[in-house]
Structures are given as structure tokens and as C-alpha cells.
């Protein structure tokens, strides 16, 4: 890794000793990786100014342990400008990626979805769709994204007019037609999600599903970005 240049974004940084930072990066080539940026905390160096979220960087690291040393860093593109709700959502994107992606697991799919989410937030795209697409990419990488096309109990295709129960550790199970008053998830919403289509109905379904599926990955520790968003002035 000593001579390899990595494409990366800063997910989080925190003070380390008196003059340094520990920086969590998300890279295309090596996945999530942490490194010490030595002597930059109280400096006015370019290196310190670059170690900010939402900026595409190239960096070189050294070291054999899980905690690397940052040797070189340079900008690939200007920082992605975000304000208001988009900024809070981007903070959520960073925190969620940092919380879920295992150290050292490279994923082209998640990296592409992560970068696309930041650019979509900058461009004021539909926030619900932007966040769900990233969450789906993370769940898919972790092997937890359900099959939106098949009933796991009967091994039959999802029916557009059917209604389904979601079982967290299995998938979607059709509710029999003779069950009175059962609401369930409309098959039409599942089929939309299987095609990557976010209709008003499928967006609502996706939000609930992601909340339930992400909970075991996030754990009991609350996401700070969520707390900040809830307390921001309206």
C-alpha cells in the first residue's frame, strides 16, 4: 500500500494526541480505512484543509497495522457544497457508511452509491430516493437486501395484486386472500423496488424496510447525524 494512490472521501476525523487527527476514509480500492494525520491539528497546512468531508481525494498511506499513517493527500475535485437539509443528510450518509462498512472491505457498488448520493444531494435531487439508494447498496453489500421478486415461503413470483408480510430474517411471504383485514405490503410496491423505481407508494415501503433492516447493523448507539437533524431550527 505504500506506493498505491487511493481514491477516497473523509467520513470522520477526531483529535489524536496533541497535534494529530485520526481520519476515517472510505476508499474505492481498500474500502473503509483509518489513518493518523500527524502534526496537522494546529497547522494551517494544505493537508489539514483537505481533510474535510465531501471532497474527492487521492491519498497514500503507509503501515502494516489497521491504523495507517497518512503520507500524502491531494484534491481530485472541489469540495461538494452542501447546505441545510442536504448537509444533514450528507452527514447521515457519512455516519451510516462509517458505521456499517467493515474495515478494509472494498466495494465498487457502495463506493459508487456513496459518491452518487453526495452529488444528488448537491443537485437537490429527491432526498428520500437518494438515501434509500445508498441504504440499499449497503444492505446489498452486507447480504441483507431482500429479494423483491419472490415469495420466500411458496417460492413464487411476487404478484402485483398480492399483499405480503416481511420477515426480517427471511423475506416476503404472501398473505392469503382469505385473511380478513390484513394490510401487508402491496406487491406492486415490491415490484417497483425490484426495478429500482421509486413511486410514492414504494418510497414509503422502502423507508420502513430500510429502518428495520438497518437497525441490527447500526446497533443501539444512536446516529449523531439523526440527533442533529432533529434539533436543527425549523
From Swiss-Prot:
Q: One GO biological process from the UniProt record?
A: double-strand break repair
Q: Which InterPro entries match?
A: ARFGAP/RecO, DNA_rep/recomb_RecO_N, NA-bd_OB-fold, RecO, RecO_C
What gene is it encoded by? recO
Q: Does the keyword DNA damage apply?
A: yes
DNA repair as a keyword of this entry, yes or no, is yes
> Which keywords belong to this entry?
DNA damage, DNA recombination, DNA repair
User: What is the annotated role of this protein in its UniProt record?
Assistant: Involved in DNA repair and RecF pathway recombination.
Q: Which HAMAP family match?
A: RecO
Gene3D superfamilies, alphabetized:
Nucleic acid-binding proteins, Recombination protein O, C-terminal domain
Short name of any one Pfam family annotated for the protein: RecO_C
Q: Which family does it belong to?
A: Belongs to the RecO family.
What species does this protein belong to? Answer: Alteromonas mediterranea (strain DSM 17117 / CIP 110805 / LMG 28347 / Deep ecotype)
Q: What does UniProt give as GO cellular component? A: bacterial nucleoid
Q: Write down what this protein is called.
A: DNA repair protein RecO
